[in-house]
Structure formats: structure tokens, C-alpha cells
């Protein structure tokens, strides 16, 4: 299998193409790396391909914050510059610039 190149980077603000939520990327899997049970729980008509990057997000919608695992094909860049209001942001990132967060330099 060819190595996949990720379209998005850690710290980028993204939004889902089909569902009303947005988030910040905190990790990337260059191909699907979750359980088969999780994958099969996605309705077949919207189930993404496994051979693409999948992103771990600190996500939010109008009601709650949560963590999400989303395929690249279902994400768009979110250039709103509005901060993500997730309680784990400060544990992972050290600052914000435009529509992305950055990690502390060690």
C-alpha cells in the first residue's frame, strides 16, 4: 500500500462536510486505525474508505464537546478563526494563530 500524505496538519481547524461539528486536529493516522466494530457501525452509504488519512479531533457542536475520529474525505478546512471551545485544548496546545493551534516547542 502506498504511503498516504495527509491534507491537514496537527493544530488545523476543520469542519465536517455532512454533520454540524468542527474541531482541531490533535493526531493523524495515515490510514484507518480503529476497531472493525467502530467502522461497521457507520451506515454503509456514508462509510469512508479505509485507505486514507483519519484524524483525531477535539470536536464541538452547539451542545457539547467530544473527541471524534474522521476520515479526510469528510473534512473541510474551517477558516472562521473562532477558537475551539474544548476543555482539553490547553493540555495539548500552547497557543492559537489564525485558524490553527500550535504545540509547545520542546
Regions found by a protein language model. Give the residues of each.
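Intrinsically disordered, low-complexity, charged/polar segments
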Residues: 47-106
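Short, solvent-exposed secondary-structure boundary/capping segments
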Residues: 32-41
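Short amphipathic alpha-helical leader/targeting segments
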Residues: 25-26, 37
Amino acid at each position: 500500500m502506498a504511503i498516504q500524505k495527509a491534507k491537514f496538519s496537527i493544530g488545523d481547524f476543520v469542519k465536517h462536510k455532512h454533520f454540524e461539528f468542527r474541531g482541531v486536529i490533535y493526531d493523524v493516522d495515515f490510514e484507518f486505525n480503529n476497531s472493525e466494530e467502530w467502522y461497521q457501525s457507520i451506515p454503509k452509504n456514508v462509510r469512508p474508505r479505509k485507505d486514507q488519512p483519519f484524524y483525531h479531533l477535539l470536536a464541538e457542536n452547539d451542545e457539547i464537546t467530544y473527541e471524534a475520529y474522521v476520515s479526510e474525505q469528510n473534512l473541510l478546512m474551517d477558516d472562521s478563526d473562532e477558537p475551539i471551545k474544548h476543555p482539553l485544548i490547553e493540555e495539548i496546545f500552547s497557543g492559537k494563530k489564525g485558524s490553527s493551534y500550535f504545540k509547545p516547542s520542546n
